[in-house]
């Protein structure tokens, strides 16, 4: 009889423990059901890149003076600059400029150190292709400006990270009157309207 009662007691404890585990799992599920979705429906919705986002490099052929500073500051010596010396003008003339974005680490040193500002960083990050040789952009391909996310008619720009808790985007331990570096995404969208 004692053995029977101990088995009933063990069964009851296991049942209560199982119910507790199921309750904990359901509590987590219901907690997540109250939140907004975290995922972005990518081809149709895109986040607005931040001000400091480093995407594909834009090149302006007319501004380039063939100084090759971009090649010297690049950690992997990536930009290819072909030029010839014009004896009449007594200066270098650019013939061809290219960057292989399959190798580029998007550090933007070339943009930062360019003396004529012929290089700039765009917000384009969709560089996927089927053949990696197509990632070798010449001066014509780099001269094209991409669509901005906010101007693309086929895309709904996501204005902010709505799922983050309040105060996450503010500066850490800064006094109230201190200015925050950069702009919040919702402020960028307000300026575009």
From Swiss-Prot:
Catalytic activity annotation: a plastoquinone + NADH + (n+1) H(+)(in) = a plastoquinol + NAD(+) + n H(+)(out); a plastoquinone + NADPH + (n+1) H(+)(in) = a plastoquinol + NADP(+) + n H(+)(out)
Cofactor dependency: [4Fe-4S] cluster
Location(s) in or outside the cell: Cellular thylakoid membrane
Top-level taxon in the UniProt lineage: Bacteria
Keywords: 4Fe-4S, Iron, Iron-sulfur, Membrane, Metal-binding, NAD, NADP, Plastoquinone, Quinone, Repeat, Thylakoid, Translocase
Family designation: Belongs to the complex I 23 kDa subunit family.
Record-given protein name: NAD(P)H-quinone oxidoreductase subunit I
Species annotation: Cyanothece sp. (strain PCC 7425 / ATCC 29141)
């Amino acid at each position: 009889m004692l053995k029977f009662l101990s088995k009933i007691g063990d069964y009851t404890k296991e049942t209560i423990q199982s119910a507790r585990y199921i309750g904990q799992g359901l509590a987590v599920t219901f907690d997540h059901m109250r939140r907004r979705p975290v995922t972005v429906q990518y081809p149709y919705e895109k986040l607005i890149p931040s001000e400091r986002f480093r995407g594909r490099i834009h090149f302006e052929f007319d501004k380039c003076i063939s100084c090759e500073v971009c090649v010297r500051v690049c950690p992997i010596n990536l930009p290819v600059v072909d030029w010839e010396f014009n004896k009449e003008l007594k200066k270098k003339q650019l013939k061809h400029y290219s960057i292989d974005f399959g190798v580029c680490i998007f550090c933007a040193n070339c943009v930062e150190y360019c003396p004529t500002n012929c290089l700039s960083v765009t917000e384009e990050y969709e560089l996927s292709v089927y053949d990696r040789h197509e990632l070798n952009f010449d001066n014509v391909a780099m001269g094209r400006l991409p669509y901005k996310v906010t101007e693309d008619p086929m895309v709904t720009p996501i204005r902010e990270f709505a799922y983050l808790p309040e105060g996450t985007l503010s500066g850490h331990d800064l006094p109230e009157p201190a200015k925050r570096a950069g702009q919040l995404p919702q402020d960028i969208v307000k300026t575009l309207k």
